[in-house]
Amino acid sequence: MALRLLLGFDYGTKQIGVAVGQVITGQARELCTLKAQNGVPDWNQVEALIKEWKPDAVVVGLPLNMDGTPSDMCLRAEKFARRLNGRYNLPFYTHDERLTTFEAKGERLVRGGQKGSYRDNPVDAIAAALLLQGWLDANAALFET
């Protein structure tokens, strides 16, 4: 199956950022932020996104430590990726998401956003777009014709 459209997920225990990316353009953009309860999203919202966007695969960010070793959250993010695969029969990929939230906060400031708390105006969707863009950039050679 040819990959054309991807959804990217920035997994978190309270919020999960979502982005969409197209292989043909090599571009990713933010979609939305889903609320989560202890890492569990509202699966009806996830299903609505899957039905609307009809992705060929999903990319889930892995929150690796700065030295490249898996963090405690990596296991939970991988479990989330496997659940997406099991529920929607979509292939999944994981991608290093180190510093994407930090970069997303900087991006929010550049756009004129707040400097304080990100609870009311989360950056998770921006982080999802950054990690998905990173995956697209890292795998561009796979899609060249």
From Swiss-Prot:
**Main location per the UniProt record:** cytoplasm
One GO MF annotation is: nuclease activity
**Which domain of life does the UniProt lineage start with?**
Bacteria
Q: A Gene Ontology biological process annotation?
A: rRNA 5'-end processing
Main enzyme class: hydrolase
The name of this protein is Putative pre-16S rRNA nuclease
The protein's matches in Gene3D superfamilies, at most eight in alphabetical order, are given as:
YqgF/RNase H-like domain
Q: What is its EC number?
A: 3.1.-.-
Compartment list: Cytoplasm
Q: Name one GO cellular component term.
A: cytosol
The disulfides recorded in the entry are: none
Which UniProt keywords are listed?
Answer: Cytoplasm, Hydrolase, Nuclease, Ribosome biogenesis
PANTHER family xref list:
POLYNUCLEOTIDYL TRANSFERASE, RIBONUCLEASE H-LIKE SUPERFAMILY PROTEIN (PTHR33317:SF4)
Q: Which family does it belong to?
A: Belongs to the YqgF nuclease family.
What is this protein's function? Could be a nuclease involved in processing of the 5'-end of pre-16S rRNA.
Q: State the organism of origin.
A: Pseudomonas fluorescens
